[in-house]
Amino acid sequence: MRAFLTRTEKNLSLKLDDISGAIDKEVWLETDCLSCANCCKKMTPTFTRQDLIRISAHLNMSIKAFKEKWLTYDKKSGDWMNTSTPCQFLDKKTNMCGIYEVRPADCAGFPHLAKRKMVDYLHVHNQNIQYCPATFKMVEKLKVALTKV
């Protein structure tokens, strides 16, 4: 899979975005995030300033208290992230998010299949295929579709 993504990044098809747009719709008809939740179990989102404001207000906490309780600052990337996994807001019995309505933008957009032009996110998909069945299916279907072009 990774080799395919690397080759695709180097030899771009002009129809890549059209093909991936159609595949994206198929993938979501076949995917149930609540049966998996690997993103919440194995990864951590980054928290934007807006995320911090929204979530801490929802929890009736100060931003400072929210950061101290659950987050760590990554000096290299400049991002606030969860201190540990699985996510503190994941209900492990139901795989549901306890702050779904106000979850971080990174979570709301994950796995970023149609976030930007496909070429701009191939490197992200390359990372996410190990965690996300939707990403894996997307890449698998893209591989088949590109052999037909």
Regions found by a protein language model. Give the residues of each.
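Short loop/turn segments that flank or connect secondary-structure elements
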Residues: 1-149
